[in-house]
Amino acid sequence: MLLEVQHVRKEFQNRTLALTDASFSVSQGDFVSVIGPSGAGKTTLFRILNGSLRCDGGAILVNGVHFESADRRTRRAIQTTIGTIYQDFALVENATCRQNVLNACLPDMAFLPAVCGFFGKERVAEADALLERVGLADKVHEPVKNLSGGQKQRVAIAGVIAMEPACIVLD
């Protein structure tokens, strides 16, 4: 099983219960929809899946490994298994499209190499090819802040594809 979410619970400090008993599993090749009204906890669940939030109960297993109790190195490896595209796209607005795609592949928000051009020609060519695949070949050097919402979404998609995750979550 690629991903198992077992009875996940999340309560925020203000006593808001965001998730009460989220449970589902995802196998390789599955398409799964998490649906619900605004405020139902979907984004909270996705933030738990990528490790930016901790759950208060239940378990998340990725390829059979318990995510919450894994050491930092293992958690980082697990996080690369799940690529997430959020509603706000989580892009660096002043950086170019290419820099944002390259940055998506870096651990722990280490953005400096993308900004300073420390990537090899092969990696840059891969980023440019991904931008071409999402219809943004002419925007490679364009700062993200100059793009439309749909174009920003495509940069975010290219960045997640660059990570080569086993699972992609679209918020």
Region locations from a protein language model:
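ABC ATPase NBD Q-loop/coupling interface
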Residues: A59-A77, F118-G120
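Conserved ABC ATPase "signature" region
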Residues: H66, P113-D138
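Catalytic Walker B motif of ABC-type/P-loop ATPase nucleotide-binding domains
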Residues: I168-D171
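Conserved ABC ATPase signature
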Residues: P143-L147, Q151
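The feature captures the beta-strand-to-loop junction immediately N-terminal to the Walker
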Residues: I35-P37
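Helix-to-loop junction immediately C-terminal to a conserved catalytic motif
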Residues: N50
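A short, flexible loop at the N-terminus of ABC-type nucleotide-binding domains that lies
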Residues: M1-V5, K10-D21, D71-R72
